Amino acid sequence: LFAVLGFANDSTKAHNAIVEKLVNIDHSSNADGTRIEKEKMVKVDYVPEIHGTLRAKYEYSPQLDASRFQVRNARFSVTGNVHQMVAYKAELELSDRGQTRILDAYVRVLPIKGLALTLGQVKKQFSTDNLRSPHNMLFANSTFIVSKFANLRDVGFTIGYNAKEYVPIEAIFGVYNGNGLYDQKIWKKHFDYTGRLIFNTCKYFSFDLNWQSIKPENIRMNSYDIGMRANFYGVHLEVEGLYKTYD
């Protein structure tokens, strides 16, 4: 369980823009927190967008009486569309504490308004804080839930639908190999699954329900997560909790 409390001196436009990014992190977000939306794409403009995040830090450990410098993130990503209904993203981590990794590599199809079909290497749709990019994080490091319970990325297929024109609800379901990013040749009889419901009740309050089911060996593990966010008078409040069972 973790909680977040943020303050701002007034409800300026800049603050509201930041809050909107924090609340609206979901399956349709690209590297800079904006959305790839079919209705906003220009039919004749296929020029890719380039994004990047660089995060360096210095740490001191009182227990060890030692310190270190680190490049925690040096991300580079390319997003764009090849058709009004087809978008793509490729993201590379050049330095994750000295390691290079391929992060996102997917194609997204938007056949009708509100519907998004994504195939490839993606972040699992579980936990709001898990879905945040480094430049949107509320702390210097990931929360306990993200670092200990959420298997961040995998290869699979997700389907998401945003019914905001009818009801303020978004739904995303995903199925994944369950082997992580670098072991994609194994034939699978059991997959990992995630489900996510986002309730955007009003501009002051929203919450989400999350479910993840994985089977790394012979035991299936199910995780249930709920997150809530509130914004009023320049204050951002956020809380998230998780419960785990074994079958």
Language model features by range: what are they?
Residues 4-55:
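N-terminal periplasmic/intermembrane-space "pro-region" immediately following the signal or transit peptide
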Residues 15-18, 22, 155, 231-233, ...:
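A broadly tuned "polar low-complexity/structure-edge" signature
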Residues 9-14, 113-130, 225, 236-247:
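Glycine/serine-rich loop-strand microenvironments at binding/catalytic pocket rims
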Residues 39-180, 189-191, 198-206:
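Outer membrane beta-barrel
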Residues 184-185:
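Inter-helical turn/loop segments and adjacent helix faces that build the functional surface
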Residues 188, 198-247:
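Detector for outer-membrane/organellar transmembrane beta-barrel domains
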